[in-house]
Amino acid sequence: MNKIICGDALTVLRTLPAKCCRCCVTSPPYFNLRDYGVSGQIGLEPTMQEYIARLVEVFAEVKRALTDDGTLWVNIADSYAGSGKGAAFYPENAKKYKQGSNRGGLGVSAITKAHPKLTGKNLLGIPWRLAFALQDSGWILRQDIIWSKSNCMPESVRDRCTKSHEYIFLFAKRQRYYFNSEAILEPAVGFNNEPIAGSIGAFGQEQSRRRKGNSKTFRGGKYTAQNTFDNSRELSRDSHGNCENNTGKRRMRSVWNMATTASGGVTHYAKFPNELAERCILCGTAEGDIVLDPFVGSGTTCRVANRYGRQYIGIDLNPEYCKAAEAEIPINLF
């Protein structure tokens, strides 16, 4: 497989075989934040309702292309109702910018007049409007994840906090889906692998045994003191016993702290970081699976998929982005 296709996302997706991809990781063009100078682009619709409707149509084809246990990961930011003065237009500066609240020298989230009933300064709520629209179309909205940007751009606005996050939504096609949580375990905060301390003499005949953590629950008188200490069920380092919990890991949390990454040339100024794509791909696929990105942009999704032994299909309407993305993906000789 391993291809980047230049063309309209909806048109190209309709040519893909059904159930050919295990996972889709993508960041669609944001609403009224960019003009990329390409006819037919998504994001410049007159209203946000039309914008969302187009994305729902695209993701319906993504759903068809996913395996029954496949997942969809969508990164998207918000925008404000207002004058539209912050928008990036082609060709002056739009080539370099994608992420809504990290636009290089512009410094503020772009604003738009595209909702007739909302006065200026209204946050449009685009991420959640899209999430609910996809849910209404049949997707299972499994989780919202916060991408907290450690290097967000400062903003000149004085009557609200500086925007430093975007959303990542996890959708599933079916109730049972592939999700390898072990692949993205994170370090446990404050983990200490030393034996848990306790007062000597508190456990009768077991007072000389080292207390290291043991089962979280017991079901009553079935356990003797000996069994209690040697129980091998789920461990808790807040308990006592003779079995040691030494993993030092925990399940990934739903706030992801990571910096944006920048690149020059024709690629996006603030593409989403490799680590973001890594987490989605590693837990959403197995080696050899096909990863899809219908708005491939700078090629981060495809590049990460290739690095971890996955196949990829990337789609973008802009020929310059397609060429740049292909150039950044190394040839996999294995």
What are these regions (language model features)?
Residues 43-52:
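N-terminal phosphate-binding loop and adjacent alpha-helix
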Residues 5, 11-26, 30, 34-42, ...:
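Class I S-adenosyl-L-methionine
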Residues 1-3:
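Extreme N-terminal starter segment of soluble prokaryotic enzymes
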Residues 51-68:
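A short glycine-rich, Lys/Arg-flanked "PGG" loop and its adjoining helix->strand segment in the class I
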